[in-house]
């Protein structure tokens, strides 16, 4: 199969997250398209716990990492807001679960390191309207988040 269009990759990631939530007895409901802050509302079956989840998906033919809007670096101060980074692979998918502000700090840290490093010719880098986050920047803490759905607090 050829390269999937970005919108198909994104929607597929949202459905994959909903499916994983369902396997854990958590109801995942997609929000209307273009909701700016989150894609899924997840709730326990008894309705006692609910969280909002933004989903970012990277397909298996992507070798640059997750492309995020620069607004990801704006903290939301909401303990019930999460981001799931989906690494969509041919057979098995990986899900990296973050509280929103934790990912916000990580992405800001990675971007600040990037922007403070001059280009090969010595000139400074210019600010861009997106942020990349990929495996080469992962710490041991990032790897502990793989398929760690307990971070959402439903356990």
Regions found by a protein language model. Give the residues of each.
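Mixed-charge (Asp/Glu-Lys/Arg
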Residues: 1-36, 41-155
